[in-house]
Amino acid sequence: MGYPGKNTKQYSSPKRRFEKSRIESERVLAITYGLRNKREIWRATEVLRKHRSGAREVLAMTSSIGEAPKTIARRDELVGTLQRYGLLGPDAAMDNILSLKVEDILERRLQTIVYRKGLARSPKQARQLITHGHIAINGQRVSVPSYMVSIAEEAGIMYYATSSLGDEANGERQRIMNQRA
């Protein structure tokens, strides 16, 4: 365990900083998902990288030692985690983990789900509503746009009870509803 006051990087920057195709694809992702900067994409890439490496480890353990209890437990843990977040279906295999994309991770962020549910007019506005404390999950205020929403929590996303947007007569809420209609 490290020093608690010293935060560590949760992402790794790309090896080729000025690769045109990567920069263009990151720009499209940043616009589509309303991300603040490229580090958010790199963080999602790092999460995906960890899941993929875990899947490769399990596949390697399966091929070398077979279906040992430790291998089965690790596989079930990995698949269960990804199923809980809605990244894999109920009958998913280990190969499905290797085929996940960064977009799949970005789709499970609170910011994206708030926008997709129609609680905001744009991904940028969804981010602003979250950081200003207008969004709650199951009645609990959440102010982190990058929060990974599980399938169980998705139905509980709504405006915070004491928020000004909690009132249906609010002007901004009316504009949001009119745009969706």
UniProtKB/Swiss-Prot annotation:
PROSITE patterns: RIBOSOMAL_S4 (PS00632), S4 (PS50889)
Keyword terms: Ribonucleoprotein, Ribosomal protein, RNA-binding, rRNA-binding
GO biological process terms held by the UniProt record: ribosomal small subunit biogenesis; translation
GO cellular component: small ribosomal subunit
GO molecular function: rRNA binding; structural constituent of ribosome
A Pfam family recorded for this sequence: S4
SUPFAM superfamilies from the UniProt entry: Alpha-L RNA-binding motif
Domain S4 RNA-binding span(s) in chain numbering: 108-180
The protein's assembly and partners: Part of the 30S ribosomal subunit. Contacts protein S5. The interaction surface between S4 and S5 is involved in control of translational fidelity.
Family: Belongs to the universal ribosomal protein uS4 family.
Biological role: One of the primary rRNA binding proteins, it binds directly to 16S rRNA where it nucleates assembly of the body of the 30S subunit. With S5 and S12 plays an important role in translational accuracy.
The name this protein goes by in its record: Small ribosomal subunit protein uS4
Source organism of this protein record: Methanocorpusculum labreanum (strain ATCC 43576 / DSM 4855 / Z)
